[in-house]
Amino acid sequence: MRLSFAAAISHGRVYRRLGLGPESRIHLLQNLLTGLVRHERIEASWARVDELRGYAEKLIDYGKLGDTNERAMRMADFWLTEKDLIPKLFQVLAPRYQGQNGGYTRMLQIPNRNQQDRAKMAVIEYKGNCLPPLPLPRRDSNLTLLNQLLRGLRQDQEASTRSSHPAQTPEV
């Protein structure tokens, strides 16, 4: 007898669906990538930004090949829906990262959307842009579970040492 149950199996999918189908996904990524090249910083849901990051990095790699490379021009023409951004890719963004191998983008999580669907949101930007820098999130290490437990342990130890050794009052 064979038992089976429904499980969340990806069946070879290595990317997020992000929409109604493969064509919708490509159009969404093209629009996001065009916005990123134009503004050098965009805000979207975490899933979209995370999926976009690889394409943004690869587009810069193609841009570094130069505008005389036929494959680089075809990729730029395909992914950028606004054709006035192709010179920006080859003349502004690619020279900025000429001596760098990868790591052209930065992703930061921002607070979730309040009024709509509470989606996890993020910002993606090209490093070295002229926009004011985003504040990097700093976690308060005093609030982590481990530090809370250690603080409680120290307080318990101090309380037990005080109770076992009462303070001696000087006699006059």
Curated annotation (Swiss-Prot):
GO terms for biological process: translation. This is Large ribosomal subunit protein bL17m. It holds the Pfam family Ribosomal_L17. Component of the mitochondrial ribosome large subunit (39S) which comprises a 16S rRNA and about 50 distinct proteins. It comes from the Eukaryota. It is found in: Mitochondrion. PANTHER family: LARGE RIBOSOMAL SUBUNIT PROTEIN BL17M, RIBOSOMAL PROTEIN L17. GO terms for cellular component: mitochondrial inner membrane; mitochondrial large ribosomal subunit. Belongs to the bacterial ribosomal protein bL17 family. GO terms for molecular function: structural constituent of ribosome. Its main location: mitochondrion. Keywords: Mitochondrion, Ribonucleoprotein, Ribosomal protein, Transit peptide. InterPro entries: Ribosomal_bL17, Ribosomal_bL17_sf. Residues 1-8 form a transit peptide.
